[in-house]
Amino acid sequence: MNNAFSPFRRLLTVLLLCIFTLVSTPSQAERIYTLKFATLAPAGTTWVNMLQEWANEVERESRGRLLFKIYPGGVQGDEPDVLKKIRFGQLQGGAFTGYGIGQIYSPARVLELPFLFNSIEEIDYVREQFMPDIEQGYRDNGYELIGWMEVGFVYFFSKEPIQTLDDLKNRRIWNWQGDAMGKAFFDASGLSPVPLSIIDVYTSLSTGLIDTVYAPPLGAIAMQWFTKTRYITDIPMANGIGSLVVSRRFYQNLPQDLQKLLKRTGKITGEKLITATRRDNAEGLMVLQQRGMQIVAGHEDLKSGEVENISSRAAASLMNNGYIPKTVIDRVNGWLADYRAGKEQEPLDVPK
């Protein structure tokens, strides 16, 4: 009798195994994806707090299918280190400043050319025109642009007051090691900076290896550089850019609904970061003054003719080495000319 029922039992066993396999193996829709995401911004800053809010929103809306693991404070290394880890699959994304963006799609850094913009409105207008090119440039190089942000207008922070280029020539100025934009600016200004990883800046200010750095107010506060400097020169050199990025490979492996979720929430987060960064930089300047830092008025000659010369020389250098093609710079200058012809300008809110 047992032999008579053995084929049935074997069939039942196979069916049960199949059902168990189907139930225990999640479908693509149920699979959990983890986005390991790095940033130089220290924990507790506006930037990291808003990144965590983004991560929480994505986890909630995806019902736990897309999770973030955020690494703040440069624990995964400087931006070139993070990009290398993304290429090797150790990380899947990060928040980058212009330096890192330049290693993804260098033409985007046309938005950081020194002394290019006269107003916030100009920045927003030109960025909007150029954004489709930036997005495609990221894709062509293996990345997906998820959100755009800013770090804000960059100023010199120094241990001694700086009003002129001659003052700068007597200072030990930091330059972000390997940064083509910084090199172009300093070469155009006739300056010889000290190249260092951003991770080494605080220690180098403490030891006296450098005595001058450049940063937006919020960055100088977040990195604690302001504790080692006493003066801020009131000439904003450039508006520092930033972006939220994931590897193209990771993005394409996500189901379409998670791709759309990541893009939608990432764009909103970038917009929120721009608004918060502009606000916090303005408030940060007031806080720094309250803590005893002095705002130094730049010499008028530096603000006018010399500024234009530096900007032109830096742009020419970046065109000649192929970092930013001439066609890109020409297009941006064209957009600026169109905007300025049709809009009344508001001056930058330079601290006094």
Model-derived features: positions:
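N-terminal secretory signal peptides that target proteins for export/translocation
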Residues: 1-8
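Signature of the catalytic double-stranded beta-helix
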Residues: 124-137
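A short hydrophobic/aromatic micro-motif that marks alpha-helical segments and, especially, helix-coil
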Residues: 24, 134, 270-272
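Bacterial N-terminal signal peptides
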Residues: 12-23
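N-terminal secretory/targeting leader peptides
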Residues: 29-122, 138-352
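Bacterial Sec-dependent signal peptides at the C-terminal "C-region" and cleavage site
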Residues: 22-30
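Short beta-strand-initiation
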Residues: 10-13, 140
